[in-house]
Curated annotation (Swiss-Prot):
The gene is EIF3J. The keyword rRNA-binding does not apply. Belongs to the eIF-3 subunit J family. One of its GO terms (biological process) is translational initiation. Component of the eukaryotic translation initiation factor 3 (eIF-3) complex, which is required for several steps in the initiation of protein synthesis. The eIF-3 complex associates with the 40S ribosome and facilitates the recruitment of eIF-1, eIF-1A, eIF-2:GTP:methionyl-tRNAi and eIF-5 to form the 43S pre-initiation complex (43S PIC). The eIF-3 complex stimulates mRNA recruitment to the 43S PIC and scanning of the mRNA for AUG recognition. This is Eukaryotic translation initiation factor 3 subunit J. Phosphorylated. Phosphorylation is enhanced upon serum stimulation. One of its GO terms (molecular function) is identical protein binding. Residues 60-106 have a biased composition (Basic and acidic residues). The keyword Acetylation applies.
Length: 258
């Protein structure tokens, strides 16, 4: 009986050993905690994937924002153009108002009134021209004298040289002197009396110098015409005397022959 009981006990232990199943998760991961860490790692992978989706969404949002920036820049440019047009119109209205109802803070001479009207008219024409250029998109690229906008003394000196070269190329024309007379009068009409006196004095000095040069040139021509010994008339008289003496000798010889 004892031997049978021992054999039965060994059989039970063998069955227990044969059918015992180890947890593969514990065998590989080293326990329940390790197995749990493994699944948590897989969850983290899913989180990374979610972050990639977030990055894609952010890129899409940035791409959608860029056109909005461009639109806002266009709006700013359009607003600037409108503001400039408003200022231009306001300036035109002020000029028109001054032309229709000129203010007279002081008593002006007829010349000064004419100069003021001409100046305002010129401003209005320039304003209209600029507005037309902006409306039709005309290119304002200019060169030479038209490109200059003198503000300093050196700028005006250079501007004067270019202007002189432009005008003096027509000095051989029959209408050049009358053209300058009208031009000088028109450009000086808005000047003050003191400035006009300076210009007048400068022209007076120039006129005196030209008169001296003319007198000197006439004196040189007279000296060239003078001949020693009585001049041209004396020379002609001597020639006639010689001719007469020759005639007299010829007649005398003819009479002796007869």
């Amino acid at each position: 009986m004892a031997a049978a009981a021992a054999a039965a006990g060994d059989s039970d232990s063998w069955d227990a050993d044969a059918f015992s199943v180890e947890d593969p998760v514990r065998k590989v991961g080293g326990g329940g905690t390790a197995g749990g860490d493994r699944w948590e790692g897989e969850d983290e992978d899913e989180d990374v994937k979610d972050n990639w989706d977030d990055d894609d969404d952010e890129k899409k949002e940035e791409a959608e924002v860029k056109p909005e920036v461009k639109i806002s820049e266009k709006k700013k440019i359009a607003e600037k153009i409108k503001e400039k047009e408003r200022q231009q119109k306001k300036r035109q209205e002020e000029i028109k108002k001054r032309l229709e109802e000129p203010e007279e803070p002081k008593v002006l001479t007829p010349e000064e009134q004419l100069a003021d009207k001409l100046r305002l008219k010129k401003l209005q024409e320039e304003s209209d021209l600029e507005l037309a250029k902006e409306t039709f998109g005309v290119n304002n690229a200019v060169y030479g004298i038209d490109a200059m906008n003198p503000s300093s003394r050196d700028d005006f000196t250079e501007f004067g040289k270019l202007l002189k070269d432009k005008i003096t190329q027509y000095e051989k024309s029959l209408y050049y002197a009358s053209f300058l007379e009208v031009l000088v009068r028109d450009v000086c009409i808005s000047l003050e009396i003191d400035d006009l006196k300076k210009i007048t004095n400068s022209l007076t000095v120039l006129c005196s110098e030209k008169q001296k040069q003319e007198k000197q040139s006439k004196a040189k021509k007279k000296k060239k015409g003078v001949v020693p010994g009585g001049g041209l008339k004396a020379t002609m008289k001597d020639d006639l005397a010689d001719y007469g003496g020759y005639d007299g000798g010829y007649v005398q010889d003819y009479e002796d022959f007869m």
